[in-house]
């Protein structure tokens, strides 16, 4: 059985992913691009697709088809198609069945045919990448697509020689790729504003289940409309300056379209841009040049109502889901238009929180489609059932540190244990906080379970021995137990869903861990030096108390002052200062030990033969063993 590829058949650009092992991989086109323009062009000798078609659009606008997704499954007399006819440089006609079609050189092409040409290109790129034939695919569609549009998409796949195993909604695909790596049972909103369509879906994710609660959208709202507003503005400004209407000149319009798209992208990061198109047209007086500055503020003014149109579907989707904005845990941005600052601002204002920008808005849908393909092929299952544990497992220890017991990618079944102790005197119980993840701090990882081991007999801190054991069987089921080695008392818990993560989510956590490596290292270092300092203070104070009356008063005063100095510096965040104060206290503590041993030796020397003392010392040192050994190689 061959690979099932995942395809995001977009209005402006398309993308294809495939599962390689347990990881989704982007299939680049021959030009190295991770996305391919959804453009088809017909020339006198050839048919061009993707970048090649887009490059020649200016000189061949009437035979260059873009945004054909807007025509999929639509009637020629529908308001959307009528509106698009006014702006498209290519000819849109009614087919014999009343559906919208395009006419090139007297021949009709259905939107399905044009889409199939794009799909064929993606299929060929995938075959070149994989080195094997590809016949099966998962193709995404806007969640708000109707049945006719879905069927048209499936037909396009069939025309391209693909067995479409599943038509999957774009927000659902995005959810699969995004994953749910922070909390179980999250409610998320996927805000998907692409080149031609807008979707918003409210989903509940967790326990390896993605459930769509409600969806809404506008299948004729996207980046193409934003571009058109800029084109209209440039046409008007040029007409004011030169008295020439560029809207009747297809070649000029195509140049304006390219410039409008680039300007829109630039204004996502810059505050203003310059559109410079020399020789845009000519009249009797000679050639004319277009030079217009466009600011971000002006762009936002031009498209404010378009952005506003995204809010009502969000309200409706929430209402249908029976939720308030406060119930949404994460807002995921999908689609290239979500890079626009105004869009991000409106999303944040509506949902009351900053959107999550952890996914690549251009690729996340195709990635999710590939994961769905892996599920259908049986290559992707609940990660708990796989033969390795995908993320490290461990518990929270003193100072909020995540202590790993089983590292990620450990082959299962496996069992690992480690002995811990109490952090306070007479501690009657310990709380076991079971975690999964790769970050050094417990709070940054995923909680799997919490349970308590009670009934620990009163004892000084550091004395009780608590063995914590993780046991993962071949089914991926995790058992965690905690046992007091002194009393034999044991408590255990079975975790049947230790991971609801896809491989993409695991990779995301690892990348996140790497990006936060420096910050995590500092946090961990300060915790470790504090713990070391705290332990030294405890043991030193205990020694002073136990040896009361036997220590030189001057030395005791020196040690006490150093203890207070260390406690004071521990209130800050300077690990170097804490280390220095700890070393100073340790040095003073060594003097305490030297004095103690000196007193002991003097006492022993006064009471008997030194050789007897030595022999006695050897006998009493049960834990000191002198032994011969042979190294076995």
UniProtKB/Swiss-Prot annotation:
Residue spans of biased composition, Polar residues class: 597-619
One Pfam family here: HSP70
Top-level lineage group: Bacteria
Keywords (A to Z) from UniProt: ATP-binding, Chaperone, Nucleotide-binding, Phosphoprotein, Stress response
Induction: By stress conditions e.g. heat shock.
MF terms (GO), sorted A to Z: ATP binding; ATP-dependent protein folding chaperone; unfolded protein binding
Function: Acts as a chaperone.
Family affiliation: Belongs to the heat shock protein 70 family.
Entry protein name: Chaperone protein DnaK
Organism this protein belongs to: Lawsonia intracellularis (strain PHE/MN1-00)
Organism lineage: Bacteria, Pseudomonadati, Thermodesulfobacteriota, Desulfovibrionia, Desulfovibrionales
């Amino acid at each position: 059985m061959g690979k099932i590829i995942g395809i995001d058949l977009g209005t402006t650009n398309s993308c294809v992913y495939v599962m390689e092992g347990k990881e989704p991989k982007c299939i680049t086109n021959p030009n190295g691009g991770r996305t391919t323009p959804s453009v088809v062009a017909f020339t006198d000798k050839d048919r061009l697709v993707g970048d090649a078609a887009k490059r020649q659009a200016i000189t061949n606008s009437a035979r260059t088809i873009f945004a054909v997704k807007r025509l999929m499954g639509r009637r020629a007399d529908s308001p959307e198609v009528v509106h698009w006819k006014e702006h498209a440089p290519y000819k849109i006609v009614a087919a014999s069945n009343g559906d919208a079609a395009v006419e090139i050189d007297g021949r009709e092409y259905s939107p399905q045919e044009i889409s199939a040409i794009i799909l064929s290109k993606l299929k060929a790129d995938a075959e070149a990448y994989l080195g094997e034939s590809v016949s099966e695919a998962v193709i995404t569609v806007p969640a708000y697509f109707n049945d006719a549009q879905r069927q048209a998409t499936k037909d396009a796949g069939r025309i391209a020689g693909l067995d479409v195993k599943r038509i999957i909604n774009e927000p659902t695909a995005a959810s699969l790729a995004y994953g749910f790596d922070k909390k179980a049972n999250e409610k998320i909103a996927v805000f998907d504003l692409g080149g031609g369509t807008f979707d918003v879906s409210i989903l509940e994710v967790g326990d390896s289940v993605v459930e769509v609660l409600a969806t809404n959208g506008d299948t004729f709202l996207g980046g193409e409309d934003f571009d058109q507003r800029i084109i209209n503005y440039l046409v008007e400004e040029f007409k004011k300056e030169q008295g020439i209407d560029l809207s009747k000149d297809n070649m000029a319009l195509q140049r304006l379209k390219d410039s409008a798209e680039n300007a829109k992208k630039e204004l996502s990061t810059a505050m203003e841009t310059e559109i410079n198109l020399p020789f845009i047209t000519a009249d009797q007086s000679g050639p004319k040049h277009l030079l217009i500055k466009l600011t971000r503020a002006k762009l936002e003014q031009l498209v404010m109502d378009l952005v506003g149109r995204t809010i009502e579907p969000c309200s409706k989707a929430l209402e249908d889901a029976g939720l308030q904005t406060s119930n949404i845990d994460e807002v995921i941005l999908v689609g290239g238009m979500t890079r626009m600052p105004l869009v991000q601002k409106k999303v944040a204002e509506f949902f009351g929180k900053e959107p999550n920008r952890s996914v690549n808005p251009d690729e996340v849908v195709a990635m999710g489609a590939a994961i769905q393909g892996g599920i259908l092929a049986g290559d992707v299952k609940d990660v708990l059932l796989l033969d390795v544990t995908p993320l490290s497992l461990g518990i929270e220890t003193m100072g909020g540190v995540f202590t790993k017991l089983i590292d990620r990618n450990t082959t299962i079944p496996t069992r690992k244990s480690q002995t811990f102790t109490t952090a306070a005197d007479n501690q009657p119980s310990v709380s076991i906080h079971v975690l999964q993840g790769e970050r050094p701090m417990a709070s940054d990882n995923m909680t799997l379970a919490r349970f308590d081991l009670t009934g620990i007999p009163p004892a000084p801190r550091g004395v009780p021995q608590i063995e914590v054991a993780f046991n993962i069987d071949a089914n991926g089921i995790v058992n965690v137990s905690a046992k007091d080695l002194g009393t034999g008392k044991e408590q255990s818990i079975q975790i049947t869903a230790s991971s609801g993560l896809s491989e993409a989510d695991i990779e995301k956590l690892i990348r996140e861990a790497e990006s936060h490596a420096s910050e995590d290292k500092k946090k961990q270092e300060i915790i470790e030096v504090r713990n070391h300092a705290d332990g030294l203070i405890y043991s030193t104070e205990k020694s002073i108390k136990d040896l009361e009356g036997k220590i030189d008063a001057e030395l005791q005063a020196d040690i006490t002052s150093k203890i207070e100095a260390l406690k004071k510096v521990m209130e800050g965040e300077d690990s170097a200062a804490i280390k220095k104060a700890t070393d100073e206290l340790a040095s003073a503590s060594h003097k305490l030990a030297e004095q103690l041993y000196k007193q002991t030796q003097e006492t022993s020397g006064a009471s008997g033969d030194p050789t007897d003392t030595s022999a006695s010392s050897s006998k009493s040192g049960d834990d000191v063993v002198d032994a011969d050994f042979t190294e076995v190689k």
